[in-house]
């Protein structure tokens, strides 16, 4: 891990560069895969008498490079905040053991004998990521007394804002068109860039499905891994809290009101990526809407 930073004073720090190479990763290897594809249809029971025999290899490669701008105000005068923007790229030749992690990439390597064809964006790659975290203690009410002080003093607000671009996705289809003898998810042929301009993306056509074509039998598809970028997310979580002190500070209480996805922004789940499925390229669900919760904590 390499970090280069330049301090701008007591209130801010600007990191410049980060690099995190990792040359080990888990790859799912089907031991039933044929060494080469042959142009003949063979009954699977002949070449695969034992189904679902897999091996895990720690031979995968991953690498992360990013530039980060960070602005921080340390707590003073009741206010602190941390703001970061990261432009980064995470690459790998494996999505984790049989498509682990976010499950948006592929279920293991299409061809374990050609891992160069598996190199692409990692499952957790966010090209753009902007975050803000802040705490602000409201200044009013400190000079009040009695009931007015209990009601108006001691309030503070918290905010966490997160904007990030979408995760990569890998198109695939079920079935063994290549006749390679395994149940690993195959990829189709890619004939053009499936990613649409943002202004053309809709829930019924998030990416250009005509760019994906099922390949002819007895060969692997030409699509790379993680060639589609899913929908980005916007998260704004807010909270208000009030501290109470009773009986000469011996009994304290804190009231909290928390608003997750406070602006009720619709964050879409990834679209369908399975060729031949009616949901291909379509978004059919969304993440949680606004959630409000209240809490009371006592300390004595």
Question: Each PLM stretch: what is its role?
Answer:
Residues 1-300:
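Short, solvent-exposed micro-motifs at the edges of structured domains
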